[in-house]
Amino acid sequence: NYLNFKCVLIDDISTDNTYEIAKKMVSGDERFILVKNTEKKLALKNIYEGVQLANPNQEDIIITLDGDDWFSNSNVLTYLNDFYNKEDCWLTYGSYAEFPSGKKGKFAKQIPQRVVDTRSYREYEWCTSHLRTFKYHLWSKIKKEDLLDSQGEFYRMTWDLSFMFPMLEMAGNKSRYIQDILYVYNLDNPLNDHKVDNIYQVKLEQEIRNKNKYESLVDDGTRPEHLLRHNRFDIAAKLIFIKDKILKRYISETLGCLE
């Protein structure tokens, strides 16, 4: 029921009539861009090219939705728009339910503040899964090479870590956990990464975790260089002046007692 959006649909060599159904449903609606790949590109490369096709503004919100999953209800986009306006955030994660069990997914939960403060996301357990949303200005600052594996190819598995870690590190306290269920993760799909090659998945995860961290883009006033801004220096100077007056009075009174 939220109308102000643009949707890039990419058919990655599907083997059924998905493309024909999608084409019929979005025909004539300029909000949709429908792409039919002629070669298999897999998730991350499709997301990378899909964002480019969307041609977003810096403040636009990007949402990733896997083709075999779905939103939990028709109000998700409205919910997210209101949430971003209220929280003034740059990135959100969570929450999702597993299909067909209906259980809440375990890989989306609140990141501890100490992890945010130290940007130690890569050392902490993975907990920023579906639903993943972020401002384009964060995405645009990710180095392309950090989306590529040691062979120079887009990550085939654990690809969400390759872009979420950099954006979490850049966003800092501008990231938010959403407790409400917005996403349904289809565990019935036999092609889920952990079902295909779990050993390879773990290997790629470690490779991504070992990459360099990104600097925070948030001015939270806690870094040393921020303490020298004119307004903070003014406060510091006043405190020093007050302490100096107290010290002089203390010395004067002490000397008076000695006399």
What are these regions (language model features)?
Residues 241-259:
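Low-complexity, charge- and small-residue-enriched intrinsically disordered regions
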